[in-house]
A protein has these predicted regions:
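Short beta-strand/loop motif that positions the catalytic acidic residue
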Residues: 138-140, 145-147, 151
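Active-site nucleophile elbow and catalytic-triad environment of alpha/beta-hydrolase enzymes
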Residues: 118-136, 141
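Alpha/beta-hydrolase active-site loop
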Residues: 35-58
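Conserved alpha/beta-hydrolase
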Residues: 5, 12-34
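Short alpha-helix in the alpha/beta-hydrolase fold that links the catalytic acid
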Residues: 132, 141, 155-164
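Gly/Ala-rich beta-loop-alpha elbow adjacent to hydrolase catalytic centers
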Residues: 61-70
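Catalytic histidine-centered segment of alpha/beta-hydrolase-like enzymes
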Residues: 177-182
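Hydrolase active-site cap/lid region
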Residues: 75-125
Length: 182
C-alpha cells in the first residue's frame, strides 16, 4: 500500500487547535507498520483495537481503504460509537477494489480467479460480504463523505453510494484533486 499517516497530517493541526486529541496510526500493510500485507477486514480489526486501546473516539477521519475499513468496523463493533465520521475517497467494496487491481496489474482471468480464491480463504468469507456501502446502512454516527470527480483509483460514484446508504450523512464532491490530493 502507498499510504501512511503522514499523508493525513493536514487534518491534525486544525483538530488540535480546536482542543481535540488526535490519534493516528499506520494500518497493517501501510507506512511504517510491521506487516507487509493486509486486507480491509484486517484493517477494520486493527482500527477497533486502536480505539479500544486509546479510549472513546469522538470522530474518525479515514481515506480510501480506511473508509471501507471504518464502515466495516462500525458495523461489526456496535460498542464503538463515534459522533462523527469523515470518509475521504472511500473504497466501496472489496470486489470493486480487486477489480481495479486486476485492471492495473493486467491479470489474466484464470490468475485473477486464483487470486480471489486465496483472498477469500484468507478472509474466511466471500469478497462480496466486504461491502462498505452495505455496511454504511448500520452506521449510527453522523457522516461526511468527500469524493473527487477526477479520482482515477476509486470512482466518484463509490462515495455517492456509501453516502446514499448512510442514514445521517452528507456527500461533498470536489473536482481536480484526484485520489491522493483530496
Amino acid at each position: 500500500w502507498e499510504s501512511l499517516t503522514l499523508l493525513m497530517s493536514n487534518f491534525v493541526e486544525p483538530l488540535l487547535q480546536q482542543g481535540f486529541r488526535v490519534v493516528a496510526f499506520d494500518a497493517p500493510g501501510h507506512g511504517h507498520s510491521d506487516t507487509q500485507a493486509t486486507d480491509v477486514v484486517d484493517f477494520s480489526r486493527a482500527l477497533a483495537h486502536v480505539i479500544r486501546h486509546v479510549g472513546e473516539a469522538y470522530g474518525i477521519v479515514a481515506h480510501s481503504c480506511g473508509g471501507a475499513a471504518t464502515t466495516l468496523m462500525l458495523e461489526n463493533n456496535p460498542d464503538i460509537t463515534p459522533t462523527n465520521v469523515v470518509l475521504v475517497a472511500p473504497m466501496p467494496s472489496l470486489q470493486k477494489h480487486v477489480e481495479v487491481f486486476q485492471e492495473l496489474a493486467a491479470l489474466p482471468g484464470h490468475v485473477f480467479a486464483r487470486f480471489i480464491e486465496g483472498l477469500e480463504r484468507r478472509l474466511g468469507m466471500s469478497i462480496l460480504e466486504v461491502d462498505a456501502a452495505s455496511a454504511a446502512q448500520h452506521v449510527k454516527a453522523k457522516g461526511l463523505i468527500i469524493h473527487d470527480l477526477d479520482d482515477s483509483l476509486i470512482p466518484h460514484s463509490a462515495g455517492y453510494w456509501i453516502a446514499k446508504n448512510w442514514q445521517d450523512s452528507s456527500f461533498v464532491t470536489t473536482t481536480g484533486l484526484g485520489h491522493l490530493n483530496i
